[in-house]
UniProtKB/Swiss-Prot annotation:
InterPro entries named among the record's database cross-references: Chaperonin_GroES (IPR020818), Chaperonin_GroES_sf (IPR037124), Chaprnonin_Cpn10_CS (IPR018369), GroES-like_sf (IPR011032)
Gene Ontology BP, a term: chaperone cofactor-dependent protein refolding
Any one of the GO CC terms: cytoplasm
Function as written in the Swiss-Prot or TrEMBL entry: Together with the chaperonin GroEL, plays an essential role in assisting protein folding. The GroEL-GroES system forms a nano-cage that allows encapsulation of the non-native substrate proteins and provides a physical environment optimized to promote and accelerate protein folding. GroES binds to the apical surface of the GroEL ring, thereby capping the opening of the GroEL channel.
Subunit structure: Heptamer of 7 subunits arranged in a ring. Interacts with the chaperonin GroEL.
Family the entry assigns: Belongs to the GroES chaperonin family.
Keyword terms: Chaperone, Cytoplasm
Molecular function in Gene Ontology: ATP binding; metal ion binding; protein folding chaperone; protein-folding chaperone binding; unfolded protein binding
Matching PROSITE patterns: CHAPERONINS_CPN10
Protein name per UniProt: Co-chaperonin GroES
Location in or out of the cell: Cytoplasm
Length: 96
C-alpha cells in the first residue's frame, strides 16, 4: 500500500532509538524514550495560502528530520510499519 499525504502534511518513519548507552548500559523506561528523529518518506503538494496559491514544502523525501511530538502528530501503521503523519510546521530541523 502507498500513502500520499495532503496539503502540508508529511509522512515520517521514526528512527529507532539505541537501547544501550555509549557506556553499554541498557536503557529502559523514560531513559529509552521514542526518538524525535526520522526520515521523510512522503510529502504533500504544499500549504494552501489565503490567496489560493500553493506554497511548496521545504522538506523532501529522504530528508532526515527532527520533529516535535505535538498535538497534531498522528501515528499510523502502513504495511505493518509505524509511521507518523504530521504538518510541516511540526518539523523543527533538517539534519544535513
Amino acid at each position: 500500500m502507498s500513502i500520499r499525504p495532503l496539503h502540508d502534511r508529511v509522512i515520517v518513519k521514526r528512527k529507532k532509538v539505541e537501547s544501550k548507552s555509549a557506556g553499554g548500559i541498557v536503557l529502559t523506561g523514560s531513559a529509552a524514550e521514542k526518538s524525535t528523529r526520522g526520515e521523510v518518506i512522503a510529502v504533500g503538494n504544499g500549504r494552501i495560502l489565503e490567496n489560493g496559491e500553493v506554497r511548496p514544502l521545504d522538506v523532501k523525501v529522504g530528508d532526515q528530520v527532527i520533529f516535535s511530538e505535538g498535538y497534531g502528530v498522528k501515528t499510523e501503521k502502513i504495511d505493518g510499519e509505524e509511521v507518523l503523519i504530521l504538518s510541516e510546521s511540526d518539523i523543527l530541523a533538517i539534519v544535513e
